A protein has these predicted regions:
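Short active-site neighborhood of thiol/selenol oxidoreductases, capturing the structured segment around
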Residues: 83-102, 108, 114-117
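Thiol/disulfide oxidoreductase modules built on the thioredoxin-like
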Residues: 150-194
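Internal/C-terminal transmembrane anchor helices
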Residues: 42-66
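Thiol-based oxidoreductase modules, predominantly thioredoxin-like and allied folds used
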Residues: 117-134, 140-152
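Mature, folded catalytic cores of secreted/periplasmic enzymes
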Residues: 89, 108-118, 134-136, 160-162, ...
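Alpha-helical transmembrane signal-anchor/signal-peptide segments
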Residues: 66-82
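Membrane-embedded alpha-helical segments of integral membrane proteins
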Residues: 1-36
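Structural motif
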Residues: 93-97, 125-128, 169, 178-180
């Protein structure tokens, strides 16, 4: 359902929130309809109505749980001077064999589909030319890729967390998110910041 809502053009936050709201409404409607047909004591009837009300939400939540960072936007403003390319809108700091870094390409692809003007680039820390080629194949043209050398200011800025996402506006590093805080609200911020 999130994919369908995303394809319609809703914000990432609404795409994540609406299915949960929808399941609650389904539960309320089902409980209202079924409550008329229950001929039991008031306590049993109330327990049954409560269970029917929360059941759709519970099932959807079991399949698609809400994680701690799903609705957060806890990016950190960048105050350090970094020696990174400034000609992109979104920089993704990654490690060559990090599974979360590789997974992040799906997120970047969704962001790029929402706003095709966004120029994203993967910077593979201490990677080889082969790592860069591997990422470039996976990225399939929606982001560029290159290797960079590790630096103390960079590691301090991203707090040693990979992947990390850096928003660049007007050649200025604005905000950094780690993988746990780069959620739908952050995605919306990135999409809306780039004209």
């Amino acid at each position: 359902m999130e994919t369908l809502l995303n394809n319609i053009g809703l914000s990432f936050t609404l795409c994540k929130f609406i299915p949960y709201l929808h399941t609650i409404l389904i539960g309320i409607v089902c409980a209202k309809l079924l409550s008329k047909h229950i001929s039991a004591s008031k306590i049993i009837r109330n327990i049954f109505i409560t269970l029917i009300t929360i059941l759709p939400f519970g099932i959807y939540f079991a399949i698609n749980p809400i994680f701690q960072g799903d609705f957060s936007n806890e990016g950190v403003l960048i105050k350090k001077k970094l020696e990174l390319p400034k000609n992109n809108d979104l920089l993704i700091i990654a490690l060559a064999d990090c599974p979360y870094c590789i997974q992040s390409q799906e997120t970047v692809k969704l962001i790029h589909q929402k706003n095709t003007k966004i120029k994203a680039e993967y910077l593979i820390v201490n990677g080889t030319k082969q790592d860069s080629i591997k990422y470039a194949r996976m990225l399939n043209g929606f982001a560029s890729c290159r290797t960079i050398k590790n630096s103390v200011p960079l590691i301090q800025t991203i707090q040693g967390s990979f992947p990390s996402f850096i928003l660049v506006q007007n050649s200025t590093f604005k905000k950094v998110w780690n993988n746990n805080t780069f959620s739908v609200r952050a995605w919306d911020e990135v999409v809306s910041c780039i004209e």
